[in-house]
């Protein structure tokens, strides 16, 4: 682990070469639930909801889940856009907005980034 100067924070990093859902399931099975401070989601849009639920299990209260591409080049507001990825992100955004387990802030930078603070 790396150590930040003047801080009690320790940075852990590791590389897992497997499908993301499999890796997240394994982390939970290994007892790592509620041990992470931060999770970043930027993967296949169809599985965003699954990645989010797994991340919510892994991140401890007070932690942050950052979700990339939530504006999807503005396509999420085009109700005529029925592409599977667009529909998946639109549905995910709606569910996230109603999730009382987190407080959220959508940042309109790049392709959109949502920060979800786990209560």
Predicted regions and their residues:
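Single conserved hydrophobic/aromatic residue that forms the stacking wall/gate
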Residues: 1-6, 10-11
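Distinct, well-ordered alpha-helical segments
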Residues: 24-29, 52-55
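Conserved SAM-binding strand-loop segment of SAM-dependent methyltransferases
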Residues: 12-20
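C-terminal substrate-binding/active-site "lid" region of AdoMet-derived donor-dependent transferases
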Residues: 47-119
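A short SAM/SAH-binding and catalytic strip from SAM-dependent methyltransferases
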Residues: 37-47
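Active-site flanking residues adjacent to catalytic metal/cofactor-binding acidic residues
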Residues: 18, 41-43, 67-69
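A short acidic, Gly/Pro-enriched loop at the edge of an enzyme's catalytic core
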Residues: 27-38
């Amino acid at each position: 682990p790396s150590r930040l100067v003047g801080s009690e924070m320790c940075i852990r990093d590791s590389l897992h070469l497997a499908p993301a859902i499999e890796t997240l399931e394994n982390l939970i099975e290994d007892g790592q639930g509620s041990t992470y401070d931060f999770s970043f989601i930027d993967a296949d849009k169809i599985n965003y909801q699954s990645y989010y639920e797994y991340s919510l299990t892994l991140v401890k209260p007070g932690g942050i889940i950052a979700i990339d591409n939530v504006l999807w080049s503005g396509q999420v507001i085009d109700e005529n856009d029925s592409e599977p990825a667009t529909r998946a992100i639109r549905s995910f955004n709606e569910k996230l907005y109603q999730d009382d387990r987190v407080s959220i802030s959508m940042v309109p930078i790049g392709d959109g980034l949502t920060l979800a603070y786990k209560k």
